Amino acid sequence: MGLITTLKRWFNMIFKKQAEEDFNIQAAEFPEMESLINRCANIYRGVPEWLDDKNNIKTINFAKSVCSETARLATLAIGIQIDGSARATWLQEQIDKVYFQIRHWVEYGCAYGTVFIKPNGESLDVFTPADVMIVDYDNQEIKGIIFKDSYTVGRKYYTRLEYHRFVETTMDGVTTYPYYVSNRAYVSKSPQSIGDEIDLKQTKWADLMADTPPILKANGEKLDGPLYGVLRTPQANNVDISAPLGLPIFAEAIEELKDLDIAYSRNAKEILDSKRIVLADDRLLMPSGSPVSAMTPQAMEHRCSEMSLPDYVKNVFGQDEKEFYQEINPILNTDTRISGINALLSQLGYKIGFSNGYFVFNETSGIQTATGVEAEQQRTIQFIKDVRDKLESCLDQVIYALSVHADLYGLAPVGAYEINYDFGDITYSYETDKQTWLSYVNTGRVPFWYYLVKFEGFSEEDAKTLADEANKENKASGLFGDE
């Protein structure tokens, strides 16, 4: 792990130096954030610094679980509808292509604190902080950034640096802020080196411009935003307030993650060591009159095998007159340990943004039914809403970037578009919903056939036929009489 981390750090230094030389810029530095993000990235990948083979400390990689659960809830039944023109239809096609990647983007955003989503000409790419270099920013708004992209062909390693920035320009007393994109390509024989600069035409990025002309709106005004989207976590950055980067969602709970791994490892080791043992005298295993020479450890092991004894039976050589026999059945502290684990899970979940009791070991999670969930899970609901708001903002930026990209490369007709988002209810319970609609039927608010179609899988025709029959049979008792 140490060697890999060192190599990555070394390559990032080369990447930074090359970018600064070729684009004549000075990269912004956030050493504290870089250290924290690298630490959290290792935890998310399942290689935290507290792993210890000697003391049997392993990891259950709960950081991955909380990031995955957050992404699952945030993107639950997400709908993205873009309407209004032929441009809108094209944008909808681009989003549909990556629909099932959106959950992954949110998970990476939770793990790294920030991810960047950028059009690549054919689809959308996701970049973590390790793959970008921030050049210029104002508060939380990034004004200049360099993206690093790469691919391999045989033993050749190709890298592309893509520099995005707004440039303040004043002509004849009028100040404008055109947007520029510059691309530089490199080839190397080693993955640890960026190599020598080559022409874009010699790479798979041949369709990209080395330097775009100034990009402005048709009326000469500044673009509404950059040609990429930024997904940040909702919580404030208390590590480096000035940095335009978000915190990994578990950054405040690293100590709890460590304690959880230790608690789990101790419990698992105790279970592993809890095997029943029977200590049996050699005289109980060997027939009377057996020569002493036959009572070697190897002979006793062979004898146990012949007798088909369980492997937990261990031979001991008795020295007393009476044969020795003892059973050892270790007592597990599982209940006590699980209580401690649950306390850690509750504290960990709360610090991340979930309600107390959302994560529970060996028990039902708190968000299984809609009954009472509005009151019990308000913290979880608000946290997921915050993540969804950040996701909406990022997707707005991405769709705008796609639209500008379409203008630059003539990919779709010019036209207005409108975006509508729809998210699933994280408190939804199918059984509760079913009972609610059945009560609507019983009170005459909706027809019985509609319930059959919605919940029982009937076609509308069959459902209406069945409902009519039920209405006739139960008319005397008043059931379905109002239909």
Regions found by a protein language model. Give the residues of each.
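Extended, regular secondary-structure scaffolds
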Residues: 116-247
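Extended hydrophobic-aromatic, low-complexity segments
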Residues: 36-37, 43-44, 337, 357-361, ...
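Activation/maturation switch segments at domain boundaries
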Residues: 437-483
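C-terminal amphipathic alpha-helical
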Residues: 98-112, 117, 267-275, 333-430, ...
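Generic structural signal for hydrophobic core residues of well-folded globular domains
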Residues: 14, 66, 70, 74-77, ...
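Extended, helix-rich architectural segments
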Residues: 1-154, 483
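Extended, charged amphipathic alpha-helical segments
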Residues: 209-375, 426
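Short glycine/proline-rich turn/loop motifs
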Residues: 74-78, 322-328, 375-378, 473
